Amino acid sequence: MAISLCSALVLVTLSQAPPPPVAPTDSLATLRGRTARDSSDAQLWLLMGRAYLGLGVEAHGATHRSSEDSVWTRAVLDTAEEALGRAAALAGPLGSSAVGDSARVFRVGAWAARSWLGWEAGGVKAGVEAWGPLPMDLRVPPVLDELGENLLRACPAGGVLLTAGDADFYAAWYMRFARGLRPDLLVLPLAAWRSDAVLRARLMADLKLGRRTGDDAWLAELVRRRPVCVSMAFERPPETRPRIRWETRPLVWVAGPEGKSPRVPPRDFVFGALRLALDGSDPWAEPALAAYTRAARATPPLCDAMATFKVAADVPTCRK
């Protein structure tokens, strides 16, 4: 049975939307037709879910859809979430297939994009009650559980964690909202702040930042008000003018007032799920390993913790 949208109007609008970020031969119309013929193909549902998720995220980009189109965006994200949930169910239990695990990860992405709608309407303090509730079966692979927990643990109290890509954002967002860790932190992709003018304006108002021009001028003011952590999924922290003095910590770069937040020692970070993911050829191990490799290069004592979990040999900096 093919997936249904919220209304005929939304279906017409989607048919006129720009091409989604899937393979050129796999347009939304093609994918809908293929799932109508074979509704048991998890890979097809994953492709369609990612296509709709791409449309939903694009609605938050530089060409942000107007507030009148929030129903359109929510319908797209609802459709993405439903397709990705179906892909995960068809592909089997968590950890049994790459297709199923990827569907679960991108399903978290659909909920994260929903949270932006909630923030735009109700402010940054709008929690799960404003755009949830989250489904009980929302999960990510253990290697991303671990990455998210490590990143949240690394940030000072009351901070803003800026993430680089899908893996570190979905991991940190999931642990923050689905698992309830570190409710004092705001988790946000740097790309979303830069590209989504509506979200940025709302966050700047809620965080009491002045009106700033320039690429990252807002960041200097944010650093004066709150601790800011930058995930080491980035190659380096953002370069701004005036320059921000970033301090290197395990897994993150940090700037801003930290108060009495204790620094987390390198030995307190865990990498057991990474070891299992590497042994199982989990594709989500790759972005986690890349972030950890960069972190070990910046903070060599992390190698001792990595050795405890038998992953040091997989990190070039830690090889002896």
Feature names for model-found ranges:
Residues 2-13:
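Bacterial N-terminal signal peptides
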Residues 13-157, 176-320:
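ER/secretory pathway lumenal C-terminal domains and tails of membrane proteins involved
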Residues 162-166, 190:
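Short His-Asn-centered micro-motif
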